Amino acid sequence: MADPWNYAGPVTQLGPGGGAVTLVDESTFAISGGAGDITAGAAQGLFFRDTRILSQFEVLLNGNRAEPLAAVTDDPFSATFVARDAPAPGRADSTLMVFRHRHVGQGMREEVVLRNFGDEATVCSVDVLVDADFADLFAVKEGRVDSDPRHGSVTTRVEEHLSDGEGEGSLALNYTYSRGPVDRGVEIHAPGAKRVTPGLLTFEVVVPARGEWSTCVEIGPIIDGRVFAPKYRCGEPVERATPSERLAEWRRQVPLVETDHPLLKQVVARSAEDLGALRIFDPDFPERAVVAAGAPWFMTVFGRD
């Protein structure tokens, strides 16, 4: 995970309407705005196996969107979004920063961190707006979700997941989609949430002076009754997840090219990173990797490849 304070790579500076950010891991990909929000009605979302399992994911502080500052993407499947809360009345600047650490892979994990740089504790409400429409990937890409004749029914329910003895229990929001034999779903786990209702996760937060508060939201897909565990789990080190370990091993094995031509060096390095990002793996033979094409919308092996 990149540390925005010490990061030395490229950083996207954001203002209103910042550009899109795309994260990919095999058949999972997420497209959001530059501030990190997945906005309802846009050609954005979290996709798994050609289905949009998350059509909205927006973080609000006290009912308002934070001001985006930067986005850092140093891996194909992870990004950090940095923003700040609106200044308090009578103050020229804000003392509350928001860091959203996102990882995708067979679902999504998002850690939300609030850091208070002020000398007084800050009380605020964190709302996460969520929705799932299970739209077909092609309908989203072509902007015809509303006219897609293959609509099914979506039901929602809130579930309480009890503690296993090692931590606190959590609330989960479950969306289920049915259309004939097609059965899709998604579970959104929100440990520490004060309230969970369809479309909304609410956290009541006190951030101590010169301190921080954090929570982690975990999104897992369901296909034909099978629940897929996200590759990145809340509470587990991200560097131990399979995509991170595979990419680290790839980077160790890539040949080093020594040249005094800076452009050639940059092209070779970029090509190696792209090849590492485009690899897909057979679940039955995980040691076998092939390079796909068409990321993110058509991440598969084409005949011409």
Residue ranges of predicted features:
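Catalytic-loop motifs flanking and including active-site residues across diverse enzymes
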Residues: 305
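Short, surface-exposed beta-strand/loop "edge" segments at domain boundaries and coil↔beta transitions
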Residues: 37-39, 87-91, 179-185
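Beta-sheet-dominated interaction scaffolds and their linkers
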Residues: 94-105, 126
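Acidic/polar, glycine-enriched structural segments that form the non-catalytic walls/loops
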Residues: 4-6, 107-109, 116-302
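A short, sequence-level motif marking secondary-structure junctions
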Residues: 51-53, 71-76, 103-106, 189-194
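Beta-strand-rich N-terminal accessory domains
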Residues: 1-88, 98, 129, 220, ...
